[in-house]
UniProtKB/Swiss-Prot annotation:
Biased composition (Polar residues): 32-52, 62-74
Assembly description: Interacts with the Sec translocase complex via SecD. Specifically interacts with transmembrane segments of nascent integral membrane proteins during membrane integration.
Family to which this protein belongs: Belongs to the OXA1/ALB3/YidC family. Type 1 subfamily.
Protein name, as recorded: Membrane protein insertase YidC
Keyword terms of this UniProt record: Cell inner membrane, Cell membrane, Chaperone, Membrane, Protein transport, Transmembrane, Transmembrane helix, Transport
GO cellular component term, pick one: plasma membrane
Keyword Cell membrane: yes
Pfam name, any one: 60KD_IMP
Keyword hit for GTP-binding: no
Region called Disordered, residue ranges: 32-81
TM spans (from-to): 6-26, 348-368, 375-395, 442-462, 479-499, 519-539
Membrane topology according to the record: Multi-pass membrane protein
Species in which this protein is naturally found: Nitrosospira multiformis (strain ATCC 25196 / NCIMB 11849 / C 71)
Function description: Required for the insertion and/or proper folding and/or complex formation of integral membrane proteins into the membrane. Involved in integration of membrane proteins that insert both dependently and independently of the Sec translocase complex, as well as at least some lipoproteins. Aids folding of multispanning membrane proteins.
Length: 569
C-alpha cells in the first residue's frame, strides 16, 4: 500500500520535473564561446533531383563564381557582414492586418507589427514580429545574384512616406527602384493584401543589354538567437530555422547545429518552404511548387543567423523582361489557416513528443471554444470529457484505494508484527493483498491515465497562438501565462490536500511526511505553469475528489453493512 502510494506521486512528480527541466533548458541554454570565423559548409542530406529542371539552380561553385557588387557570397548563399545595418529612407505601409516598415537601404522589411496580436510588454500595443534595433535583429531581406544586380545592400529609391490600404482596396503595392547598371533595370515590389499576413515580394528585371542574362533571386530571414521577449515564465516551443519539402517533410535547423557546422537538411528541391520560427509566430518564404530552388541556412557572426532560398529568375533575352515572385508569410501560427497557405506549414505548431495526443486535444478545445466563446470554459469542458473517457479506469483505481483504506489497520499490524524484517513484511503484505483480492498498484491508475493528457495540454497551451492572451474570468487574462496572483495554484494545493485525506494513510513515517509536503511542493511547481494547465488540473482534482468520495462512501457503507450482518448472525 505504501509502495503504490509512493509510486503514484513519484510518477506525477517526475512528469513535473521533466517539464521543469525543459523550462530550465529553454530559459538558460548553454552558451557558445565566441567564434572567429563563419562556419564552413554544412552537412547536407537528400539533395533531391531539382538539378534536372530546365533552369538550373546555382550550386556552391556557380553562385560563388558570380561577382556581385555591394555583396558577398559564401557557399552559394548571399550574406552580409555582421554588424549594424545601414539606414535609408523609411516607408511605412498599414493594412487591416499589419504595419510594416521598409528601409530603402537594401529594400528590407525592417519592422512588421501584427495589429491583431498584442505585445507581451504592453497588450495595448501590437506585437512586433520583425524589428531591427540594438537589442534585437529579425528582418526580411531579398536580392538578386548576378553581375551588377541589386542585393540587400543596394540603395533603392522610392517615394518615402506612409501608405495605407484604403477602404474598398484589396491590395496595396510599394515599388522600389534600383540604380540601372549596364542596361539592366530592376524594380522590387511589395504587395500587401487585405485580411492576410501574406506579402508578395517580387523582382521585375528589364534587360536592355545586347546579350541575354540569367539572374537568380534570393529571399532570406536574418535574425539573432534571442528568445521572444515576454517568455520568461513559460517555455518557448522552439526558436530557430525550419524547412519543409515533400521528400523530407518537416525539419528543424537549430542554431546550435549551425554554430557547430553540422546542420543537416535537404538543399535542392522543387517544392517546400523555409522559415524562422519562434513561440506562436513564424516568418516563411513560400516559393511556388515545381520551381527549382536551393535552400540554405548559415551562421553569419556572433549571435546572427540567416535562412533563405535561391530561385531562378530565368533567362532574359535582350529587350525583354521577367518577374519572379516569392510570397512571405509573417504572422501567427493559426492552425486552421496554415495548411491552406502552403503544404506542411501547419507542422510548425509543435506539441512535442506527444503530438499524437496534443493535436486531438487542440481540436477538441477548438470545438468547445466554438460553442462557448471562452477558452477557459473550453478547458473545463475538455477536462470533463477526458474524465468521462477515463471514468472506468479511474473508478477501478479509486475502488482499490477505498479497499486499501479499509484494511489499513490490518496492514499496520502486519508492519508492527514483522518489525525491521522488511523481506518477511513485504511477503506478508503480498499474501494479504492476494487474500483480500486487492491490487496494490490499482490506485496508480487515476494518475497514470492523466499524465499523457497533462503533458500534451501543457504543450498545447504553449504552442497554440489561439490561446495567447485568451482570458477566462476575473483576474485570469491570459491562460497561456502563469496566474499573476497565484490563486489557482494555491487552490490546487488545497484540493490535493483534500484528496489526500480520502486516500489510505501511509503506515511508514517517512512516506507519511513526504505525502504531507506533496501538496505544497506541487503548488510551488504550478506557480510557473500556465494558468490554463492549472485550471485543467484543478477541475480534474475536484472531479476526482467527488468521484473518489462517492466510491469510498459506497465501499465503506457496504463493508459496514457486511460487518453488521456478520454480527447479527
Amino acid at each position: 500500500m505504501d509502495t503504490q502510494r509512493f509510486v503514484l506521486f513519484l510518477i506525477f512528480a517526475t512528469s513535473l520535473l521533466f517539464l521543469w527541466d525543459a523550462w530550465q533548458k529553454e530559459q538558460y541554454p548553454a552558451t557558445q564561446g565566441p567564434k572567429t570565423a563563419v562556419q564552413g559548409t554544412e552537412t547536407q542530406a537528400n539533395t533531391g533531383t531539382a538539378g534536372t529542371a530546365e533552369t538550373p539552380v546555382p550550386g556552391d561553385q556557380l553562385a560563388s563564381s558570380v561577382p556581385q557588387r555591394g555583396s558577398t557570397a559564401e557557399n552559394g548563399a548571399p550574406v552580409r557582414a555582421a554588424g549594424k545595418l545601414e539606414s535609408g529612407d523609411k516607408i511605412t505601409i498599414k493594412t487591416d492586418m499589419v504595419l510594416a516598415e521598409i528601409d530603402t537601404a537594401g529594400g528590407d522589411i525592417r519592422r512588421l507589427e501584427l495589429l491583431h496580436q498584442p505585445s507581451k510588454e504592453d497588450k495595448n500595443k501590437p506585437f512586433a514580429l520583425l524589428e531591427s534595433d540594438p537589442e534585437r535583429v529579425y528582418i526580411a531581406q531579398s536580392g538578386l545574384i548576378g553581375e551588377g544586380l541589386p542585393t540587400h545592400k543596394t540603395r533603392f529609391t522610392a517615394e518615402p512616406g506612409a501608405y495605407e490600404l484604403a477602404a474598398g482596396q484589396d491590395k496595396i503595392q510599394i515599388r522600389l527602384s534600383a540604380p540601372e547598371v549596364d542596361g539592366v533595370q530592376v524594380t522590387k515590389i511589395y504587395t500587401f493584401h487585405r485580411g492576410s499576413y501574406l506579402i508578395d515580394v517580387s523582382f521585375e528585371v528589364a534587360n536592355q543589354r545586347n546579350a541575354a542574362i540569367q539572374p537568380f533571386s534570393y529571399f532570406q530571414m536574418l535574425r539573432d538567437s534571442r528568445p521572444p521577449v515576454g517568455s520568461f515564465f513559460m517555455v518557448p516551443t522552439y526558436t530557430g530555422a525550419a524547412l519543409y519539402t515533400e521528400e523530407e517533410k518537416f525539419r528543424k535547423i537549430e542554431f546550435s547545429a549551425l554554430d557547430k557546422g553540422n546542420a543537416s537538411y535537404p538543399k535542392n528541391a522543387d517544392n517546400g518552404w523555409i522559415a524562422m520560427l519562434q513561440q506562436y509566430f513564424l516568418a516563411a518564404w513560400l516559393p511556388k511548387d515545381k520551381l527549382p530552388r536551393e535552400y540554405y541556412a548559415k551562421r553569419l557572426g556572433e549571435n546572427e543567423y540567416t535562412a533563405g532560398v535561391i530561385v531562378p529568375v530565368g533567362q532574359i533575352e535582350p529587350g525583354s523582361s521577367a518577374t519572379v515572385t516569392v510570397p512571405l508569410y509573417a504572422g501567427p501560427e493559426e492552425q486552421s489557416k496554415l495548411a491552406s497557405i502552403a503544404p506542411g506549414l501547419d507542422l510548425v505548431v509543435d506539441y512535442g513528443w506527444l503530438t499524437v495526443i496534443g493535436a486531438p486535444l487542440f481540436w477538441l478545445l477548438s470545438l468547445f471554444h466554438s460553442w462557448t466563446g471562452n477558452w477557459g470554459v473550453a478547458i473545463i469542458l475538455l477536462t470533463m470529457s477526458v474524465k468521462l473517457a477515463f471514468f472506468p479506469l479511474s473508478a477501478a483505481g479509486y475502488r482499490s484505494m477505498a479497499k486499501l483504506r479499509l484494511v489499513t489497520p490490518k496492514l499496520q499490524r502486519l508492519r508492527e508484527q514483522h518489525g525491521n524484517d522488511r523481506q518477511r513484511m513485504h511477503q506478508a503484505m503480498m499474501d494479504f493483498y492476494k487474500t483480500e483480492k486487492i491490487n496494490p498498484m490499482g490506485g496508480c491508475l487515476p494518475i497514470l491515465v492523466q499524465i499523457p493528457v497533462f503533458i500534451s495540454l501543457y504543450w498545447v497551451l504553449l504552442s497554440s497562438v489561439e490561446l495567447r492572451y485568451a482570458s477566462f474570468a476575473l483576474w485570469i487574462e491570459d491562460l497561456s501565462a502563469p496566474d499573476p496572483y497565484y490563486v489557482l495554484p494555491v487552490i490546487m494545493g488545497i484540493s490535493m490536500f483534500l484528496q489526500q485525506r480520502l486516500s489510505p494513510p501511509a503506515t511508514d513515517p517517512i512516506q507519511a511526511r513526504v505525502m504531507q509536503i506533496m501538496p505544497l511542493a506541487f503548488s510551488v511547481f504550478f506557480f510557473f505553469f500556465p494558468a490554463g494547465l492549472v485550471l485543467y488540473s484543478l477541475v480534474n482534482n475536484v472531479l476526482s475528489i467527488a468521484q473518489q468520495w462517492q466510491i469510498t462512501r459506497m465501499i465503506e457503507g457496504s463493508a459496514a453493512n457486511t460487518s453488521k450482518q456478520k454480527k447479527a448472525n
